[in-house]
Amino acid sequence: MVHFTPEDKTNITSVWTKVDVEDVGGESLARLLVVYPWTQRFFDSFGNLSSASAVMGNPKVKAHGKKVLTSFGEGVKNMDNLKGTFAKLSELHCDKLHVDPENFRLLGNVLIIVLASRFGKEFTPEVQASWQKLVSGVSSALGHKYH
């Protein structure tokens, strides 16, 4: 379990309140699919993913990215109970979708890069460290049901 200090919680929520979930979620998922193309196999129904520009402009990628980041927001609200917050999603991704849990870590790292690019100097090393704790905790919670 990840322990969040009061400073961590402030660092995370101060950024989260300014995040455009649709925009950042869409970009984060799209970047994941471009940089780690093997992750595309989970998104066969999304249509054209044949090039970086196709992925970045794909409306289904953007919509699912929003859905993913909206769910991530539940983790922001429930930092002290990440395992419980993501229990059902962990089960879904493990038992039905068979997603490699390493992909959760990769997406978390991409999210941090997108946030850093959006927030610039406001995304200080301390803020980044707090966000690393959060994405690590969320990744661990999502991977919890795996055997």
Swiss-Prot record:
It holds the Pfam family Globin. The modification Phosphoserine is found at residues 14, 51. The keyword Phosphoprotein applies. GO terms for molecular function: haptoglobin binding; heme binding; metal ion binding; organic acid binding; oxygen binding; oxygen carrier activity; peroxidase activity. It comes from the Eukaryota. GO terms for biological process: hydrogen peroxide catabolic process. Keywords: Heme, Iron, Metal-binding, Oxygen transport, Phosphoprotein, Transport. Red blood cells. Heme b binds at residues 64, 93. GO terms for cellular component: blood microparticle; haptoglobin-hemoglobin complex; hemoglobin complex. The keyword Metal-binding applies. Residues 3-147 form the Globin domain. PANTHER family: HEMOGLOBIN FAMILY MEMBER, HEMOGLOBIN SUBUNIT EPSILON. Belongs to the globin family. Hemoglobin epsilon chain is a beta-type chain found in early embryos. This is Hemoglobin subunit epsilon-M. It comes from Didelphis virginiana (North American opossum). The gene is HBE1.
